[in-house]
Amino acid sequence: MNTYELEILEKLYFETFINQRILASSTGLSVGVVNRSLKQLAADGLIDKHGQLTEKGRQEIRQRAPRNAVILAAGFGMRMVPINLSTPKALIEVGGEPLIERTIRQLHEQGIRNITVVAGFMKESFEYLMDEYGVDLVINPDYASKNNLHSLALVADRISNTYIIPCDIWCARNPYSATEPYSWYMVSELVDEDSTVRVNRKRELVTISDKEAGNSMIGISYLTEPEAGIVRENLRRMDADEAFDEDFWEKALYARSASAASAASAAKVPGAHSHEARNGFKDRMILQAKVVSSSDFVEIDTYEQLRDLDSDSNHLKTDSIKAICSALNCKENEVTDISVLKKGMTNRSFLFSAKGAKYIMRIPGEGTDQLINRRQEADVYRAISGLGLCDDPVYINPENGYKITAFLDNVRTCDPDNLDDLRRCMDKLREFHSMHLTVDHTFDIFGQIDFYESLWDGNPSIYRDYRKTKENLLALRPYVESLPKDCCLTHIDAVPDNFLFYRPAGAAGAAAAASEAASAAQDLDQAQAGELLQLTDWEYAGMQDPHVDIAMFCIYSLYNRQQCDRLIDLYFDGKCEPVTRIKIYIYIAMCGLLWSNWCEYKRKLGLEFGEYSLRQYRYAKDFYRAAKELMEAEGQNA
């Protein structure tokens, strides 16, 4: 049967047949389509000569009826910042009711009580649903590294006469039903540039090119046989192939040719556009489109979308938004254009606009209170305030680490392989060090090495010779501490990513840039002329030998010994004393071990840093040997 025949069969399941025109009006089909469909239904024995359903016809409807639902609620909901810092997206309230509870209630209204919720991020928040609504909770432990195709694959065996529902959809009207005549995927009539499909005349969902706009994808779907079986098979096969780890579950709605290989998974979005056909995927979904009115469905994917739907939602009143309004003397509805910033190993930051300007709100990541003293950070910002080293924070809270800074347009970071960039960065670093600023706290390298090691909870290092490596560096400690130093406020995290080149807006900014450019090296590339330079991210700063900053720059850049020597020579203008070079070599080794220990701690939390972590440990060994060689050559004894 085709979908027209199934729609008519469902209509006759509930309503008595009167004539073709009334049936055409109630289904939205043409009289011609209705006539052809009625003839076929009669020929198949599904309706009698009076247009009433036979028992066979009723059985056909009953066997296609919904049996269960799966709600996908495992992801971070990254775009929901700052609400997602404390509440999973599925539990955001609209009209005082959590989104997922509204969905469950609407399913219950249609008699669907077999409901599975796939959770991951803040999974404990969903536990109450098991008692209150009798749902089955399935946990996706890989929610941070895999997309929702994996979530649905975990419950693939449950997909048969099943609604698949995203957790972030608010439905004004109940979209679920006690009967569903065929499989479908829901889209609206709204034209959406982010969509990957459009509805054709046959009500098929065909893929479109990147330059085209399609029908807005609501994301709700219904799967009955035979399509449910195809999706089950696709999910299992794709989930076993890591090439699909980042895919949305909608990828499983595309049939593949028999010769297609698993390498055909190059696309990373639903539908994945027309190139999938070339890679062995069909150019259309296996499901029919169910086109609905966009006014009845709202995807709540951002803070502002929630505010547009329910300006009184309790979840709009977050600590971070309150801090913004207080610091900038603005109202909640004046905070706009909120978007997440993914940069930063320890912070969860977001960009926003208010009163005609752009800002960044820094929200410290989970567990960073163990690693960073926010009161000390605030002391550092007070010490450097007004000195032109960085934009002064608009707001900083030493209790929770919240920080608001102005957003810089046209920014680039230092290229560690660009000699002009390196000259300017070392000039800036030397300028900062020459200020001889002070604070009341120090950055203790060996203290930090031991601190990160203590966070391993008694577990040994993953490196077999860790103890020997550490002992070697400890043996050099008395020597390096005996050397003369001019301790002052030191950045500690003076790495290429924290040197920001930018072009300021306005006449005053242009004048400042011109002044700084004039004082820079004469052979500065013309493309870089007019750029200002500042240092950012002062979280680790404290009193220390300023030459530690040179070491930190080297190890983050993954420099070899020759490149390290070049940077040292740039900082000292080619006049570095051998003893000072030895000292910096030792700092490179010590700081390498420090960040290696940091990486080991993060690894135990499930975070991997690839080559970076191994290279840090190599610095501890290689530059210990380099320092010893130079010490012997210079007649220095440890």
Please annotate each region the language model reported.
Residues L9-E15, Q20-I22, S26-T27, L53, ...:
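N-terminal glycine-rich phosphate-binding loop and ensuing alpha1 helix
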Residues D310, H315-T318, N597-A638:
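ATP/Mg2+ or Mg2+-diphosphate-binding catalytic cores
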Residues H547-C576, M590-L607:
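Active-site activation/catalytic loop segments of kinase-like enzymes and analogous catalytic loops
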